[in-house]
From Swiss-Prot:
Pathway: Protein modification; protein ubiquitination. GO terms for molecular function: ubiquitin protein ligase activity. GO terms for cellular component: ubiquitin ligase complex. This is Ankyrin repeat and SOCS box protein 12. Interacts with CUL5 and RNF7.
Length: 308
């Protein structure tokens, strides 16, 4: 992030001069209708030009935002619907550069998330915010929300947008890392199914090259004493089992995760497992990670490809 990036952020978040001095009553009326979850009143107001011109204006206490951001944060689905029908900017930013989708994800409002995505919201959130909807859903264990985001094209290898000097922090901030550390096995598996890299949760070699000693997911899972299922999933999805260095303490050999890793190192991967890896990687490279159901193969093999 450079000075030009910072200047761009502030320019986006600065309110228009005329907005600062006008429309206070209209903005308050729109926000009050959203607060009250009164979609009928909101619809009536937005049919009037004096109110509609402020549909994308940021206002309110705390974190000033648009009416759509407010509706998304409260989970007021009907208000979200009315605002979108009247042309509200689906990716409008609040003063923290967060989109309505990010706000809906943060508050766990699945139906609002689904409606915003169907209206064209960017599943990755704003490029001007350090976090992303996928990172938030992975951290919170919001499986259904994460599934919606990934199904609408969100990147499973998304990274927090940190400056170069903090890249050593970013290397361990991917959604897989968060799902593992916070113990959300279902989200962890889902991310892998959508093509998350099982080694570093990062496919940006430029970023990895700037990290002096990047830690693999296997290392992180072992360090945090994650359940053996996490280790097994990483092995099954093709993680490099020779990357992490194992502890020299003999007592650590009793750890179930380390036992799994040692067993994988000592046992050649089966031809069936290798075939599954090749097929899944080919589908991911073609951005078709969920196309297994379309393959002309027996159902039992489709289930195997989906790790079921």
């Amino acid at each position: 992030m450079n000075l030009m990036d910072i200047a761009k952020i502030f320019s986006l978040l600065q309110p228009e001069k005329e907005e600062e001095d006008t429309g206070t009553g209209e903005k308050q009326a729109l926000n009050q209708a959203v607060y009250d979850n009164d979609s009928c009143t909101l619809d009536h107001l937005l049919h009037q030009e004096r109110y509609k011109r402020f549909i994308n204006s940021r206002s309110g206490w705390g974190i000033p935002g648009t009416p759509l951001r407010l509706a998304a944060s409260y989970g007021h689905l009907n208000c979200v619907k009315v605002l979108l029908e009247h042309g509200a900017d689906v990716d409008s930013l609040d003063v923290k550069a967060q989109t309505p989708l990010f706000t809906a994800v943060s508050h766990g409002h699945l139906e609002c998330v689904r409606m915003l995505l169907e209206a064209g919201a960017c599943p990755s959130g704003s490029i001007y915010n350090n976090c992303s909807p996928v990172l938030t859903a992975s951290r919170d264990g919001a499986f259904a929300i994460l599934q919606e985001l990934l199904g609408h094209g969100a990147e499973a290898n998304v990274k927090a947008k940190l400056p170069v000097w903090a890249s050593n922090i970013a290397s361990c901030s991917g959604p897989l890392y968060l799902a593992a550390v916070y113990g959300h096995l279902d989200c962890f598996r889902l991310l892998l199914l959508y093509g998350a890299d099982p080694d570093y949760n990062c496919t940006d070699q430029g970023l990895l090259s700037r990290v002096p000693q990047p830690r693999t997911l296997l290392e992180i899972c072992l360090h945090h004493n994650c359940e053996p299922e996490y280790i097994q999933l990483l092995i099954d999805f093709g993680a490099n089992i020779y990357l992490p260095s194992l502890p020299v303490d003999p007592t650590s050999q009793d750890d179930k995760g380390i036992k799994l890793l040692l067993q994988a190192r000592a046992t050649p991967r089966s031809l069936l497992s290798q075939t599954r890896l090749v097929i899944r990687r080919s589908l991911c490279r073609a951005n078709q990670s969920q196309a297994t159901d379309q393959l002309d193969i027996p159902p039992v093999l489709i289930s195997y490809l989906k790790h079921q």
